[in-house]
Amino acid sequence: MKLAAMIKKMCPSDSELSIPAKNCYRMVILGSSKVGKTAIVSRFLTGRFEDAYTPTIEDFHRKFYSIRGEVYQLDILDTSGNHPFPAMRRLSILTGDVFILVFSLDNRDSFEEVQRLKQQILDTKSCLKNKTKENVDVPLVICGNKGDRDFYREVEQREIEQLVGDDPQRCAYFEISAKKNSSLDQMFRALFAMAKLPSEMSPDLHRKVSVQYCDVLHKKALRNKKLLRAGSGGGGDHGDAFGILAPFARRPSVHSDLMYIREKTSVSSQAKDKERCVIS
C-alpha cells in the first residue's frame, strides 16, 4: 500500500479502519497510585509533562502509525493504581501485548506492588492456550520513576536486578524521570524491540501528525506520488513514518476485548505453527 493511500486510510474521518490483527497491539501501564503512570503516557503521546496530579480510574488512548508500507494500531491503557475491580485488572492483563510496570524510587510499597504485578501477569498469561509459566513470552519493562528524587531512594539496586532476572529478551529495567524526560525514549525503543514491533513506534522516531493535518498530508503524499512516477523524486517523504493520535478513543467493550484475545491467540498460534514447519 502506497503512503498516500495509507495516510487517507488512517484519517479518523474515513470509514471504520480495517487493520489486520497482526498489526494491532495494546500497551498496558500498571503500577501503584502516584508513581507517574499517566505522566509516562503523556510523554509518549504528546511529549508534555503535567505536574498536577489527577487520580486515574482508567484512561484509554489509540494511536495509528504508517510505517514502511503498513498501518499499525497501538492501544494504550493507563490503569488505575487502586484496582477496585480485580476482574477488570485481569482482563486488562489478558488483552495486553506489551507491559510497562512503574514504581517510584522513593516509595518502597510501590516497588513491592510491581513485584506482585509481574507475577500476576505471568500467572494470567499462562492461562492462554498452550502456555505455561515457564514459556510465557511477555514483552515487559519495569520503570523506576522519579529518578530526579534519587536522594530519597528506598529501593536497592540488587532488589531490582533480582526482580528483572537475567533474560533481557523477556524483561528490562530503566530508571527514568517523566518530569525531566530522562531515559524514556530508550525505554520505549527497548520495549518495542522486545515485542518485535517497528522501532518507529517510539515517540522520537516518527512524525506526529494532527487529525486536522490529514487532508493536507494526503494531498502532499499524492503530489509526491506523481513526482515519483515522473522520475522527479518526492522529497523523501514516501519513506517517513507517521503517527496519528485518534481523538475521543473509547475503551472497547468486554465482548470486544474477549474477541480481541481470541483473535490474537489464534494469530500467535498460527505463527508458532509456521515456525515449527521445516522442509528438509
Curated annotation (Swiss-Prot):
InterPro entries attached here? P-loop_NTPase (IPR027417), Small_GTP-bd (IPR005225), Small_GTPase (IPR001806), Small_GTPase_RasD (IPR052236)
Name of the protein described by the UniProt record: Dexamethasone-induced Ras-related protein 1
Q: How does it assemble?
A: Forms a ternary complex with CAPON and NOS1. Component of a complex, at least composed of APBB1, RASD1/DEXRAS1 and APP. Interacts with APBB1/FE65. Forms.
Q: Which UniProt keywords apply?
A: Cell membrane, Cytoplasm, GTP-binding, Lipoprotein, Membrane, Methylation, Nucleotide-binding, Nucleus, Prenylation, S-nitrosylation
What subcellular compartments does it reside in? Cell membrane; Cytoplasm, Perinuclear region; Nucleus
Q: Which residues form the propeptide?
A: 278-280
Which source organism? Rattus norvegicus (Rat)
The UniProt PTM text for this protein says:
S-nitrosylation stimulates guanine-nucleotide exchange activity.
